[in-house]
């Protein structure tokens, strides 16, 4: 009976380590969202107050009777008019040219029948370099999203964030927004343009078959990681 020799445990562990490393190279790196703060906030519960018996009783957070309804407290909502149009163009070039020429006579003693009775030496050199480069980018994003006030800064500015999800033909679309809004820029319609929002972060992503079609396959990612070129 022929005895079969099994590989040692060290060999098996090494093979498993190589396989795990290869599979890790094929794995798709998850993309973290650029907006890390909460997408909504709940307003604090108002304190119960005894009715004074007057005609007007202040509502939540003591909002005065003759003030507008612009957001100013945590939990208030605000409409963001997204109107982003960014164009960038860059071009560069370099050109150098250098030439040199040297020519002189060297008197020498005649020998070998006057073969080297007179010698002329000359040297010529040239060096040229030319390079050009350019890059351009254009991004346009238009839409609306309603966000929630998540924090009120000491100077009165509002920290807002929110998201919108849409399920279209088995594809889930996400629109996320966050930033800092100056209450003075809010219009009477309770809206503000994204160009007036400080530290604005706008994210548009999707999950579904279309997004998977735009992703490189695992076997292609494997060869991309191990290929030397």
From Swiss-Prot:
Q: Where in the cell is it found?
A: Cell outer membrane; Bacterial flagellum basal body
| UniProt keyword terms in alphabetical order | Bacterial flagellum, Cell outer membrane, Lipoprotein, Membrane, Palmitate, Signal
Originating species: Burkholderia cenocepacia (strain ATCC BAA-245 / DSM 16553 / LMG 16656 / NCTC 13227 / J2315 / CF5610) (Burkholderia cepacia (strain J2315))
Residues where lipid is bound covalently (S-diacylglycerol cysteine): 26
Protein name in the entry: Flagellar L-ring protein
Q: Which domain of life is it from?
A: Bacteria
Q: Where is the signal peptide?
A: 1-25
What would be one Gene Ontology cellular-component term for the protein?
bacterial-type flagellum basal body, distal rod, L ring
Its quaternary structure?
A: The basal body constitutes a major portion of the flagellar organelle and consists of four rings (L,P,S, and M) mounted on a central rod.
User: Could you tell me the membrane topology recorded for this protein?
Assistant: Lipid-anchor
| Record InterPro entries | Flag_Lring (IPR000527)
- State the lipidation positions (N-palmitoyl cysteine): 26
The Swiss-Prot or TrEMBL record describes its family as follows:
Belongs to the FlgH family.
């Amino acid at each position: 009976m022929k005895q079969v020799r099994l590989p040692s445990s060290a060999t098996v562990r090494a093979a498993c380590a190589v396989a795990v490393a290869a599979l890790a190279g094929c794995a798709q790196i998850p993309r973290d969202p650029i907006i890390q703060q909460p997408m909504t906030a709940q307003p604090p519960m108002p304190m119960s107050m005894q009715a004074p018996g007057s005609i007007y009783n202040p509502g939540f957070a003591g909002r005065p009777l003759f003030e507008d309804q612009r957001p100013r407290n945590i939990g208030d909502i605000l409409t963001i008019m997204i109107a982003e149009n960014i164009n960038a163009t860059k071009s560069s070039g370099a050109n150098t040219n250098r030439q040199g020429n040297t020519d002189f006579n060297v008197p020498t003693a005649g020998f070998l029948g006057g073969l080297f009775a007179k010698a002329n030496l000359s040297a010529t050199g040239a060096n040229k370099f030319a390079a050009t480069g350019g890059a351009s980018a254009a991004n346009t994003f238009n839409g609306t999203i309603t966000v929630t006030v998540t924090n009120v800064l000491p100077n009165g500015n509002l920290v807002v964030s929110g998201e919108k999800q849409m399920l279209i033909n088995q594809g889930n679309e996400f629109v996320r927004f966050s930033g800092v809004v100056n209450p003075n820029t809010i219009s009477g319609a309770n809206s503000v343009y994204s160009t007036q929002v400080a530290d604005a972060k706008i994210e548009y992503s999707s999950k579904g078959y279309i997004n998977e079609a735009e992703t490189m396959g695992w076997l292609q990612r494997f060869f991309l990681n191990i290929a030397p070129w």
